[in-house]
Amino acid sequence: MIHDPAQLERERPDRLRVLWLSTLAFTLMFAVWLMFGVLGVPIRKEFGLSDVQLSWISALAILNGSLWRLLAGILADRYGGRLVFTLMLFFTAIPAYLVSRAGSYEELLLYAFLVGFAGNSFSVGIAWNSAWFPKDQQGFALGLFGAGNVGAKCQPLIISTWRPHFGSS
C-alpha cells in the first residue's frame, strides 16, 4: 500500500482510468451474462423451444457465472485485473457472438454456459479496483464499479436498436 501522498497523487489518473475502464467492461460483461433475459422470447420463437428449455439456457449462464467467482478473484490477485479482465472480455465475446450463429438447442446450451463466464467479472473488478485505491477511497471506487450492474438495464435499449439491422425483427 502506498502511503506517500506525492506517489498517490501521481497515480491518481491511473487509478481513475482503471476505475472507469473496469466499470465499462463490467457493464458490458453484465449485459452479456444476462442477455438471455431479453433475447429469450425471440430465441424461443426461432427454435420452437418450450419454457423449460428456455429456462435451461438462462440457468446455465447464471450458474456458470456463479461457479468460478472465487477462482476469478484469485486469478486477478495473482496475475492482475487488467490481464484477467481482458481475457474474460475476449473469451466471453466469442460465445456471445456464436449465440447469434447457433443452429440447434444444444449449441445454445453450450454457448449459454460459456457466456456465463462473464458473471465472474464482478470478482475480478473488485480485486482489481481494491488494489488500485487506498482504503479511504475504496468505498467510492467499489460502489462506482458495482454500478456496472446497469448493463442488465441497457440490454433492452441496445438490443431493440440493433436487432433490426441484423436481419431479425
What is each PLM-predicted segment?
Residues 17-51, 72, 155:
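Extracytoplasmic
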Residues 25-26, 30, 62, 96, ...:
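Helical-face signature of the major facilitator-like transporter fold
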Residues 34, 62-70, 120, 153-154:
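Residue-level signature of mid-helix packing/kink "hotspots" within the transmembrane helices
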Residues 43, 75, 162-163:
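Hydrophobic alpha-helical transmembrane and interfacial-helix anchor sites in secondary transporters
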Residues 55-62:
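Short hydrophobic/aromatic, small-residue-rich stretches within specific transmembrane helices
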Residues 67-106:
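Conserved MFS/SLC helix-loop-helix module at the cytosolic interface between two early adjacent transmembrane helices
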Residues 111-148:
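Cytoplasmic helix-loop-helix junction between adjacent transmembrane helices
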Residues 145-169:
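Helix-loop-helix hairpin linking two adjacent transmembrane segments in secondary transporters
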